[in-house]
Each structure stands twice: as structure tokens, then as C-alpha cells.
Amino acid sequence: MPVILPVEGKSPRFGHSCFLAPNATVVGEVEIGDHCSIWFNAVVRGDVGSIHIGEKVNIQDGVVIHATYQKTKVRIGNDVSIGHNAIIHGCTIEDRVLVGMGAIVMDNAVVGRNSIIAAGAVVLEGTRIESGTIYGGIPARKIKDIPPELISGQIERIANHYLVYAGWFERSLETPPCGAKIFPTCE
């Protein structure tokens, strides 16, 4: 069953049609928009700083989202995909962003809209990622501008696929066993 816990009187809040895998963890001051999915072994920890997640966001397997006590918050826009085992820490990710597998985005970084953070990249504290670009490497540096077809062909495609994947669970789990949560059909 997903771990959904209040911390210091602040409880997670979920929009409509959100899927939480049976072993996902969401705690504390977390607000999640409509049509989001939080996959296996993902941790969204709003205990020391608030976390706001927009609509149509997929937080893939093994992702950790957290902040720094009394210093940072996490803000994630709409239509965002956060790849397997990425770490999102005390930063802002604007709309229509793809964060690649194993990437790390540190405190006070801002990832501009329509951007891609390559797999394994490390976005250092305070870095500003330009809108419409691909950044990669350690530390992350600009690789190139994103052509418009890559935005629809990559960023939008992945976000839309995760809506489909969550739908598979919703259809197969009319009465979800093993603790899977599909909001609002299962509370």
C-alpha cells in the first residue's frame, strides 16, 4: 500500500485521476495536480519544505523529490516527466520538461519550460536552464537548442504515454489490491 502520511499536521493533497504505485511514498506538505502518476519506489518527501506538482506529471520509478529545511521548496510545472532514479531537490521545474533517468537537479536551480535534462546530468545549485534547450553532463551544460518537433516528439510523447500506463492500472484494478491508489476512485 502506498505510504501517504501527514508530517507536523500537513498532509498530501491529490488532484483527480492520480495513480500511486503500491510502494510509492508521499509525505507532508505535498500538493499534486490532476492526472499525475507516482511510480514504484518513488519518494515525494514534503517534510522539510513544500512540494507542488502540477498537472499531467509522471514521477517514475525510484525518483526522490525533497527540499532543504527552511531554505528551499520544490515547484514542478505541468506536463513534466521525471525519469527513473532522478533526484529533484529544492528546485523549480517549469512546464513541459523531461528530466532524464538518473539526473540530479539541485537546490535553487530553475529548469526553463520546453527543456530536456539528459540522463545522468547533474544540474548544480543555482543553475538556470534556458527554455527550449537540452542540458547534459557533470556539471550540466547546454548541449543545444531544442527544435519544435523534439518538444512534441519527445517531451509531450512521454508525458502522454504515462497517462496511458496509469490507465492500464486503473482499468485492471477496479478494486485495487495490494494498496495501489487511483484517485478519486480509491481512497
Role assignments for model-derived ranges:
Residues S81:
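Short proline/glycine- and basic residue-enriched helix-capping loop/turn segments at helix->loop/beta transitions
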Residues M1-K10, D47, I53-E55, D61-V64, ...:
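Glycine-rich hexapeptide-repeat left-handed beta-helix
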Residues G9, F14-T68:
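A positional/architectural concept
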